[in-house]
């Protein structure tokens, strides 16, 4: 399309030039004849000439159809462009007139690529416009936020558009300031805060309006609410003892009103929790300051009905007398109390606790007749037993029957394990002439020897307490009412019920000697289906006619802290020596005595080895073999003590050991020497040198 327009434009130029020149011959048809300069003579002769009538003008010139069509197209294009420009002229921004397009097309010039020099931009700190954390924003802009108004800050935080909120708040502030200026001009204020004269006026009005109360009434209310301590504040008044509180003096001379319900009884005994728990201690002394003595109580059963007045004495920090409360490092008043008459007993006599229910309750006919007051009172008030806190403390006991120690006959407890244990007797001071035959049933393994069962029982019975368990008679019974509880079907039939009878006491002379008696074994196991007559056996075991059990001795050695022996003969020799040196009621007591024996052994012979004692006192690590050799040299009985027991005792006394593994030959020789010393000590167990 563009090429055609250019062609039509060239034709028009040629026609215009031909018409404007005078040399153009008349009769020639424009644009149909070849110009003279372009034509040859031969061509001019051959061409047919067309004559144009002279009477026709320029408008009557005939133009070819193609040229006329091109001209029409150009005119139409100009019309369209002119119309488009008229439309654009109606808008605010007028388009500039475009430059005339040259008719001759310009040559295409190759575009040169301009290579711009790349400049390295310096990194600039990027402004963080978006608030990610309110805490971080407040931390970074705390100075500017301090100046801002609180309402403006809160709205900006909630809305998130600080610019919009700032504009709104500034507009409101300007309106408020304008209103304030207008009000200030119209009604100027003289006193923003109250001055002294205004306060006096307000106080006078309040005194006129409020009801008038006398000073004595105010003091009585003050005393009723806070106590008679006007010069102290509430905290100081709460720390003062009742007898140290000083009544406030009335400024107007009027007497104060003391309410009778606030008076304290200074003669009432005061007990602390530590005094009640400790039982017998140095704190349980009579108060000599008050001189108060309680009267004996004739009827003990009326003690529960009486209410003892107890006033709590708060220890005061102003007193110089130290506190008598145990384990207390604070200073305070002495807290003492009076012992009641039924609580006061002879200190030399052993403490006797109340009778409580046990596994085998004794018959009422055989109850002892001594100490009728306590026992009758305890039985009369079986539901409300009064705990004698002045004689007994809250000790931890092994029995689950009662939290207090009880005076009762020897019984066999049935714990959760299969091993039977014997209940130790404590505080047994009086021997009873006779005891009823009591029976207890226990579940035992049918495959276990009955001698092993009673060997553990007999070993714990003291020879001086024969009234607790005189003779044991065993028989295997089957109780249909009490079914044996087993864990699985495989264990069914492997348990039997053993019935133990507590026979009447026999004289000590009737028991045969331990060495002369021959050991007899029970017929075990006995099936539960045998007849009752065939199951009953005579009295075979006593407390003196059976040798100690080997398993029991091994357990005792382990509890006490002795080394295990190879055979029973050595174990019996060690046991006899141990009983002669450390007489005790239980293995735990002998273990404590053995620790004390080691401590006394070192303290008494500390001058013989000054270097070793210096190392011990300065917490210098020593070799265990060195300490063991020293102990053996002092007393050969220490060779029988287990090494773990000695190390535990040394750890409790601050003796530090070190591991010496540098010389294995030396340790081997030491072990050999220790074995030789052990054999020598076993051979010399019954020598006079080992006597206590």
From Swiss-Prot:
InterPro entries with a match to the protein in the record = Slx4_ascomycetes (IPR027784), Structure-sp_endonuc_su_Slx4 (IPR018574)
Q: How is it modified after translation?
A: Phosphorylated in response to DNA damage.
Q: What is its main location?
A: nucleus
Where does the UniProt annotation locate this protein? Nucleus
Q: Where is this region: Disordered?
A: 39-59
Question: What is the annotated quaternary arrangement, including any partners?
Answer: Forms a heterodimer with SLX1.
Protein family per UniProt = Belongs to the SLX4 family.
From the Swiss-Prot or TrEMBL record, give the protein name: Structure-specific endonuclease subunit SLX4
**Which organism encodes this protein?**
Kluyveromyces lactis (strain ATCC 8585 / CBS 2359 / DSM 70799 / NBRC 1267 / NRRL Y-1140 / WM37) (Yeast)
């Amino acid at each position: 399309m563009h090429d055609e327009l250019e062609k039509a434009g060239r034709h028009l130029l040629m026609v215009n030039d031909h018409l404007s020149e005078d040399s153009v011959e008349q009769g020639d048809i424009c644009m149909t004849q070849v110009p003279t300069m372009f034509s040859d003579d031969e061509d001019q002769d051959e061409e047919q000439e067309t004559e144009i009538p002279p009477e026709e003008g320029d408008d009557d010139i005939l133009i070819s159809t193609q040229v006329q069509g091109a001209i029409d197209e150009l005119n139409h294009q100009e019309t369209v462009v002119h119309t488009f420009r008229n439309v654009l002229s109606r808008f605010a921004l007028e388009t500039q007139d475009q430059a005339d397009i040259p008719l001759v097309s310009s040559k295409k010039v190759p575009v040169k690529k301009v290579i711009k020099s790349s400049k390295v931009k310096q990194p600039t700190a990027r402004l963080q416009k978006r608030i990610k954390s309110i805490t971080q924003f407040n931390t970074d802009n705390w100075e500017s936020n301090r100046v801002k108004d609180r309402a403006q800050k809160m709205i900006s935080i909630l809305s998130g558009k600080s610019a919009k909120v700032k504009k709104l708040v500034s507009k409101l502030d300007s309106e408020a300031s304008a209103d304030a200026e207008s009000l200030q001009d119209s009604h100027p204020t003289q006193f923003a805060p109250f001055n002294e004269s205004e306060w006096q006026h307000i106080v006078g009005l309040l005194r006129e309006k409020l009801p008038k109360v006398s000073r004595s009434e105010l003091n009585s209310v003050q005393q009723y609410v806070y106590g008679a301590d006007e010069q102290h504040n509430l905290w100081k008044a709460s720390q003062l003892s009742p007898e140290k509180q000083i009544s406030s003096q009335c400024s107007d001379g009027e007497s104060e009103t003391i309410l009778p319900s606030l008076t304290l009884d200074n003669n009432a005994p005061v007990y602390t929790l530590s005094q009640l728990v400790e039982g017998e201690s140095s704190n349980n002394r009579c108060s000599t300051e008050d001189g108060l003595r309680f009267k004996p109580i004739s009827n003990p059963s009326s003690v529960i009905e009486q209410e003892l007045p107890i006033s709590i004495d708060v220890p005061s920090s102003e007193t110089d007398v130290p506190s008598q409360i145990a384990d207390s490092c604070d200073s305070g008043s002495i807290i003492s109390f009076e012992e009641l008459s039924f609580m006061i007993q002879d200190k030399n006599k052993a403490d006797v606790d109340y009778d409580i229910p046990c596994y085998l309750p004794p018959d009422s006919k055989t109850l002892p007749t001594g100490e009728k007051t306590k026992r009758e009172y305890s039985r009369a008030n079986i539901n409300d037993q009064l705990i004698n806190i002045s004689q007994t403390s809250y000790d931890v006991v092994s029995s689950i029957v009662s939290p207090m120690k009880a005076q009762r006959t020897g019984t066999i407890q049935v714990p959760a394990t299969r091993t039977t244990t014997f209940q130790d007797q404590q505080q047994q001071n009086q021997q009873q002439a006779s005891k009823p035959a009591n029976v207890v049933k226990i579940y035992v393994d049918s495959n276990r020897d009955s001698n092993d069962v009673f060997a553990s029982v007999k070993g714990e019975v003291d020879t001086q307490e024969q009234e607790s368990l005189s003779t044991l008679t065993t028989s295997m019974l089957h109780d249909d009412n009490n079914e044996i509880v087993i864990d699985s079907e495989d264990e069914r039939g492997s348990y039997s019920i053993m019935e133990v009878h507590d026979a009447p006491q026999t004289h000590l002379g009737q028991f045969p000697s331990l060495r002369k008696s021959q050991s007899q074994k029970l017929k075990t196991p006995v099936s539960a289906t045998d007849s009752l007559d065939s199951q009953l056996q005579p009295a075979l075991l006593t407390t003196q006619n059976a040798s100690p059990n080997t398993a029991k001795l091994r357990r005792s050695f382990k509890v006490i802290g002795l080394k295990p022996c190879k055979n029973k003969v050595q174990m019996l020799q060690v046991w006899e020596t141990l009983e002669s040196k450390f007489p005790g009621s239980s293995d735990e007591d002998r273990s404590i005595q053995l620790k004390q024996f080691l401590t006394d052994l070192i303290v008494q012979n500390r001058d013989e080895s000054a270097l070793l004692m210096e190392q011990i006192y300065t917490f210098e690590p020593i070799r265990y073999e060195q300490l063991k050799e020293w102990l053996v040299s002092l007393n050969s009985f220490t060779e029988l003590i287990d090494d773990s027991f000695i190390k535990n005792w040394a750890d409790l006394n601050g003796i530090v050991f070190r591991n010496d593994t540098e010389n294995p030959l030396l340790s081997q020789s030491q072990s050999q020497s220790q074995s030789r010393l052990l054999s020598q000590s076993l051979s010399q167990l019954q020598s006079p040198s080992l006597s206590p």
